UniProtKB/Swiss-Prot annotation:
PROSITE patterns: AA_TRNA_LIGASE_II. Its cofactor is Mg(2+). Tetramer of two alpha and two beta subunits. The gene is alpha-PheRS. Belongs to the class-II aminoacyl-tRNA synthetase family. Phe-tRNA synthetase alpha subunit type 2 subfamily. One of its GO terms (cellular component) is phenylalanine-tRNA ligase complex. It is found in: Cytoplasm. This is Phenylalanine--tRNA ligase alpha subunit. GO terms for biological process: phenylalanyl-tRNA aminoacylation. Keywords: Aminoacyl-tRNA synthetase, ATP-binding, Cytoplasm, Ligase, Magnesium, Metal-binding, Nucleotide-binding, Protein biosynthesis. It comes from Drosophila melanogaster.
Length: 498
């Protein structure tokens, strides 16, 4: 509130019937918003004044229009660039810059220049010796506040050329109200016990409640973008008839993480520079013994139609505990459970979304801890075609319809495919996941029937989240440098379901 300004407004109204806030701003040499703010303060004290909203429309220069006032119109600038001997049109366009095309067209229509085709190459020549820059002169009148004097045709043309813009200004016409006074009486904000006891409240004026005020935003928790995207992925899996797998085993044995997946014990992914091994407890001891023996055999000497890897499989390696490197370890446990359930095998569709851990170098796109999204389908006679069809359906629900597949190698799937999608924003194909058909060497030792195949695919949760929220550096999504304002103000996640 501006105490002196409010009283000046009231004193002025005492001498006149009506006053526009725009006129008051000019009269008092104050910003119009300050006048409006003082008006609201006056209105808070009761019906001292009445205010009628009025709308004013006026013409103003755009940035391009101001440049024309300062430097000249596009057509005049093009005319000035044409020397007496003429100039090639391409050279003229290059010299004229971004507005040369418009300037050339207007200069031609005004009859200021012509294209001389009697020479090779054709030259642009001046057609008149002098010109009058009418556009500049008319825009100068607008700059002086005389835009209402322009003919309607010119106004429409200048708007089309984005030299002028129409601005709408709201003001208030003030008049004396039924409680008019030239001074403001202090309004009470609280009704006290003393006021009620001595009856003083009846003589005082109280400030009215503002029921339109937004108030202070409540302090509350906010969902991280990863959780928002995770919810969308989970809903898509549930819509497709999948069941969620329990993923609470962050610490896993090498047996379930590697050996059960037919990944040899000499595989480089099992080295310490790729995997976080656990010291306490360092080993696991409880395994299904008959299943463990079948896994040992298929690794060492083969079986189920396979030659195996032909190496000395060691229990000590399988016992080592680690932070799981993929949620496929969870899938292995679920498939073993499915193979040995009462009543025999039944077709199943599973999914999981949870954390995995890799001993990787941290950079803008890689973390040592991230989320893996995995889908698994077990049924009789599944083929690579079923996998491709399922992937098209899954990614269609994500709003991705352009997919390509590239052959790849995984120890536990054959055939295997990398999944690529076309990113319109980046205008290129990007890798979004991996997929394949689980090998018989992995499935048959579990006890699954020979005619049962399992198809699976996986992708990270971080990459689609970064794409969805326009984040380029993963450190801006996870870690100590995350802007909490981004978490608080981030929109809900609605993937473009096709």
């Amino acid at each position: 509130m501006h105490p002196d300004l409010t009283e000046r407004i009231l004193q002025h109204l005492e001498t006149t019937d009506k006053a526009d806030t725009l006129d008051l701003a000019a009269l008092f040499a104050e910003d119009h918003q300050k006048i409006v703010g003082s008006l609201k303060s006056i209105q808070a004290h009761g019906e001292l004044v009445t205010a009628e909203t009025v709308t004013h429309k006026s013409l103003g220069l755009t940035d391009e229009g101001r440049a024309v006032v300062e430097n000249g119109s596009h057509e005049a600038l093009v005319y000035d660039l044409v020397p007496p001997e003429g100039i090639a049109q391409a050279a003229l366009m290059a010299a004229g810059g971004a507005n040369a095309k418009v300037g050339f067209s207007k200069a031609m229509s005004h009859g200021w220049i012509l294209v001389d085709k009697s020479v090779t190459p054709p030259l642009v020549r001046r057609k008149v010796d002098t010109i009058t820059d009418v556009v500049r002169n008319q825009l100068q009148q607008v700059a002086l506040g005389k835009g209402d004097q322009l003919p309607a045709k010119e106004v429409a043309d200048f708007k089309k050329r984005k030299l002028l813009q129409e601005t709408t200004t709201k003001s208030f016409v003030l008049a004396r109200g039924p409680e008019f006074a030239t001074t403001l009486t202090k309004l009470e904000t609280d009704l006290t016990v003393e006021m009620l006891a001595n009856g003083l409240w009846d003589q005082l004026k109280f400030k009215a409640y503002n029921f339109d005020a937004l108030g202070a935003p409540p302090t509350r928790g906010h969902l991280h973008p990863l959780l928002k995207v995770r919810t969308e992925f989970r809903q898509i899996f549930l819509e497709m008839g999948f069941s969620e797998m329990p993923t609470n085993n962050y610490v896993e044995s090498s047996f379930w993480n590697f050996d059960a997946l037919y990944q040899p014990q000499q595989h480089p992914a099992r080295d310490a520079h790729d995997t976080f091994f656990v010291n306490h407890p360092a080993k696991s001891h409880k395994f299904p013994q008959d299943y463990l023996e079948r896994v040992k055999k298929v690794h060492s000497v083969g079986g189920y139609g396979s030659k195996g890897y032909g190496y000395d499989w060691k229990l000590e390696e399988a016992q080592k505990n680690l932070l799981r490197t993929h949620t496929t370890a969870v899938s292995a446990r679920m498939l073993y459970k499915l193979a040995n359930q009462e009543g025999g095998f039944k077709a199943a569709k599973y999914f999981s979304i949870d954390k995995v851990f890799r001993n990787e170098t941290l950079d803008a796109t890689h973390l040592a801890e991230f989320h893996q999204v995995e889908g698994v389908i077990a049924d009789v006679g599944l083929t690579l075609g079923d996998l491709i069809g399922t992937l098209y359906e899954f990614f269609r629900k994500l709003g991705i319809t352009q997919l390509e597949f590239k052959p790849a190698y995984n120890p536990y799937t054959e055939p295997s495919m990398e999944i690529f999608c076309y990113h319109p924003g980046l205008a290129k194909w990007i890798e979004v996941g991996n997929s394949g058909v689980f090998r018989p060497e992995m499935l048959l030792p579990m006890g699954l029937p020979e005619n049962v195949n399992v198809i699976a695919w996986g992708l990270s949760l971080e990459r689609p989240t970064m794409i969805k929220y326009g984040i380029n550096n993963i450190r801006d999504l996870v870690g100590p440098k995350v802007d909490l304002k981004m978490v608080e103000e981030g929109p809900i996640c609605r993937l473009d379901h096709a």
